[in-house]
Each structure stands twice: as structure tokens, then as C-alpha cells.
Amino acid sequence: MHTVVVGTSGTTADDVIAVARGGARIELSAEAVAALAAARGIVDALAARPEPVYGVSTGFGALASRHISPELRAQLQRNIVRSHAAGMGPRVEREVVRALMFLRLKTVASGHTGVRPEVAQTMADVLNAGITPVVHEYGSLGCSGDLAPLSHCALTLMGEGDAEGPDGIVKPAGELLAAHGIAPVELREKEGLALLNGTDGMLGMLVMALADLQRLYVTADITAALSLEALLGTDKVLAPELHAIRPHPGQAVAAANMSAVLKGSGLVGHFQEEEAPRVQDAYSVRCAPQVAGAGRDTLAHARLVADRELASSVDNPVVLADGRVESNGNFHGAPVAYVLDFLAICAADLGSIAERRTDRLLDKNRSHGLPPFLADDAGVDSGLMIAQYTQAALVSEMKRLAVPASVDSIPSSAMQEDHVSMGWSAARKLRTAVGNLNRILAVELYAATRAIELRRHLTPAPASQAAIGALRAAGVQGPGPDRFLAPDLEAADAFVRDGKLIAAVEPVTGPLA
């Protein structure tokens, strides 16, 4: 099994994916253990001094003015975890919780939080045992970090609350820790606060969304090319020189991907005999590279933000190398929240343009010779009429999900925390949007491949033939009389989600970016 080593200098998106989705094991580097011990020494020295230090010997938030006596400080740290574990609603997905815990461990290991090495090791042990704290949908405002979600994770480290075992069964956390030989942690000064105060949940969801959207943008180039081919469109608009004079990098990549898929097609540029030659195609076909390209460039910006966050140590207060413990505002989730919202907008638009191409394939007045709704016997059969309804419903929801969460803010903690990012909410709606986009592109794929097969007298591009063959091998049926459609659509959705479309096409086209 792959092992991820956690050091003091952050982590990578690949490591987050490996831990969250691949179940990779985690080890703390010797450098991290030394940094943890050094920072803990600073906290212990400050705890012994008479003057108050926020997070070490004071209350929290609006209660920070109270100086806490030494005999109450362990209770203070336990209490902050228990009281902040106030989430409600459905459970958050296992991969999100694993990403959240791993990213918190990454910050703890940086040596800027003052957490003891044994607490960090317990975090790694819990992840390695496949124990997943029960975390709920609601409870984070995205400022002072993802407080409630992280608190539920810290509660598990204490042996309290509920968690899911590696067998998928939810049990009391104390039972699961005991079954795996893990001793619950006894928190000391600052440790409870340090386990709660980070943007790890929203960052984990951003990292996973970026991986999913990279796949979906390549998928969208393929489905756009298939639709162009099925509509007998022209590939002249994909010429590199046209995109060079508007030098957005993502646009050129999208056009190149579409060109590679369409290479060798006998359908491209073929016009029905009764039609005048088309000078240009509809916007949803002709402008596909521009829309997908703009989204790709937004992905690139979001990756830059994610990489910076992955290299960050987010806590308040932080332990500095010169021995100071300083309050700061690095827990504010605005940088992550903004790009999460940007990506939801891009996903909505990519889904919107795909739906417009699908509708064009089904409309006999605009499909250039295809039967109405791609039906076998139109009138007796409805073909893919309602598949487009489903796609349209998904697009409509995508538009609602594109409304930014980060423009909202609601004060909390007696107006001490009077501006928040709502980044967790932005991340949650982006996860829904990513799933919807997958389904939208699956419907376009289903319609476009069916339409190409109905052009029986013309030879599709080799890449298109490979896509159709793989889709049929996956159990998605081709043209024919009406049948129960939902199983085909679900199979197409899984085909796209598992990356099988890209895997089928790339042996013909070469790698698609």
C-alpha cells in the first residue's frame, strides 16, 4: 500500500487524493516529530508564565478575556472540543472526512501549532486504522476554520462521539480506538484549539473537486467533438491559428483535444444534399473551446490557490520559530471560498452548453437529418425526449448552485467573529455541481453516440468508434425501440465518472490535456 510521509513543509494534491480516496497509509517524518516537540516546548514555557496567552491560558472567541488557571486548562481543551462538536444534518462523505483529518495533521506537523508529537501520531493512527469520525453537513461558517467538522474529528481522538470503522459500521469512537489498540488523547494547553482551527474541510473538497473537474473538462471536449460530428459540423473552427490570435491557454487546449477526437471523421463537414453548405455552426458547437477553455483557465487559478493552501500552516494562534505565539487571521477561508464559487460557475456553464448541444441533436429541425428525439419510430417511440428533460433539470439546479456562497456572511460569537467566508458551504454545493456535471455529460455522450450510429452511411472518426465501442461494452445500448432508459443513463454516468471514456479515446488520440 502507498505510504504518504508527512513533513513540515506541507503536502500535495496527489497525497490528499491518495489518503482520502486511496486509503494510503501515513507516516510522520523525523523532521516533523522534532518540529512538533520544539513547538510544544515553546507552548509549555508560555503556559508556565503568569500573563495570559490566547489559546494557551485563556478562553476562546468572545470569551478570550478570561485567564484560565493551570488546573482548569486540560478541562478547557476538552470542553472546546465537546462544545464545538455541534454539527447537524446528514453525514459527510468518508473521503471528505479523511481529507479533512489528513490536512489538519499536515498543519499540526508543521511545528506551528504547539501540539505534542503523540497527538499527531494518534491522528495518523486513526487514519491508518480506517476509522472515520462521524461529521455532519452543517456547522461550519468557513472562518476560524471548519470548526464543527474538525471538532467531531477531535472528539474521536478523545475516544468520544461516534465514528465509522473500516467495515463501514458506526460505533462509539472509544470502542473503535480500543479495538485497534489506540489510546485516546488527553489534551493539554492549546491542543484542543489547534485541532479545530483550520480551513481543512473546504480545502480537501477543493482538491478533490479539482481532480474531478480535470477529468470532466477532458470529457466535455470529447462529448462536444462527438456532438459536432453527429451534427455534421465543421472542424475548421478548431484550427490552431484561430486560437493563437486569442491566446487563452485553456481555449487552445480544448480546441486541440476536439481536433484530436475528430481526426479522420467522415461525418465532419458532410452536408445533407438538400441543404446549402453551412458556413458556421451554432454557438453551442462552434464556441465549445472558448467556454471549456475559460473554465480550464479558472481551474489553473484554483490549483494555484490550492497549492498555496497545501503549503500553509493555518492555526490561531501560531507558534513562530523565534518563540512567539501570535494571533492572526489566516484561518479566514476567503481564498478557498472564492475559487470554490468560481468553479461552480464554470461547471454550470459547461453543463449548460452541453445541454444545448444535446437538445440540438434531438430536434429534427436542427439536427440535419436525424430522426426526432433520435427515436426508432418517432410517434410510437419517444426516443431520448425525457433524457433531455433530466439533463435540463440538472442544468437548472447547476445554475442555482452557481450562486456564490462567499458573498454571504453572518456574524457569530457575540460579534467577535463578525465576518466569515462560508467556504464550507461553497465546497458542499460544488460537490453537488460536480456530480451533476458528470450526469449532464453522460447524457450528451449517450445522445451523441446514438446519433453517430444513426448516420450509418458515414464513417465516424476512429476515436469516436473507440468511444462507442467502449460505451456499448459497458452495457449502454445503442439505437433501437424505446426501452427502460434509466439503467442506460446510470451506466453512462458511471462510465464517465470512472474515466472510461477518456481511457477508450486516448489510445487513438494520444494523451488529452
Region spans (language model):
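Glycine-rich, flexible loop motifs
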Residues: M1-V19, G23-P50, P70, Q77-V135, ...
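Well-ordered mid-protein domain cores that form the structural environment of catalytic cofactors
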Residues: S110-N128, T132, C143-L147, D167-R188
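C-terminal auxiliary extensions adjacent to catalytic cores
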Residues: M1-A24, L28-A35, A39-A47, S69, ...
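Hydrophobic, well-ordered secondary-structure segments
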Residues: A120, A124, S144-L150, Y217, ...
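FAD-binding core of FAD-dependent oxidoreductases
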Residues: Y54-I68, L72-L76, S83-K106, V134-M158, ...
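Hydrophobic alpha-helical context, especially transmembrane and signal-peptide helices
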Residues: A48-P52, G130-H136, L150, P172, ...
